[in-house]
């Protein structure tokens, strides 16, 4: 069903409105950090062959998301009822992740006793502006086609602050743990390199290495031409190279690559 979901998200995409874009879902389900145990509970609503609604979870599994096609808002009540009854709610931690343009879901949630507990800003860059941060001396860009999975997994391990769990080692060992491990980090990267998800555009990823070849910064890129959307996910810099402008240089590289393709 991945193509059904992707096409649905792309078809109803509206910048800054209506929920997460297509890469959000596909990036999550192909990632080794994602608990897919309860993915069978994700549900599509169809009108004939046309997808008109979707309820799904991400990480943690108690975070529930909604997507609905304009004109089918009458399904919101049914979708919320389904989420409450069937989607994971361990330790009463189920929460609905709602966005601008999803007021109909907010209203239905409030009727059932939900209340807003926090909000956050979804950052977007307008390509009418310009990004032109220079790569610091001593670093260089790595061609995405030449990526070394072990180096990239190590970058993500430390870049996402997992170093407190231990050093990045024994990455090829058997992984018998539910916690995040070097094995899971490596498995996720290796899988994405060897067998990319259907709509992956890893050829636009940005990888920055130091003079010794250690990967210092990684910025993934999902290009959705139908939406003119350049979706950056993920982004990390290893601790010893933070606050040096590497992420800014990576985003500038994305800008110079994606703007000529039509990104807005």
Model-inferred region functions:
Residues 10-87, 216-230, 238:
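Conserved donor-binding loop and adjoining core beta-sheet/short helix segment
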Residues 73-85, 237-239, 243-260:
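Conserved acetyl-CoA-binding loop-helix of GNAT-fold acetyltransferases
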Residues 58-63, 68-138:
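Acyl-donor-binding surface of acyltransferase catalytic domains
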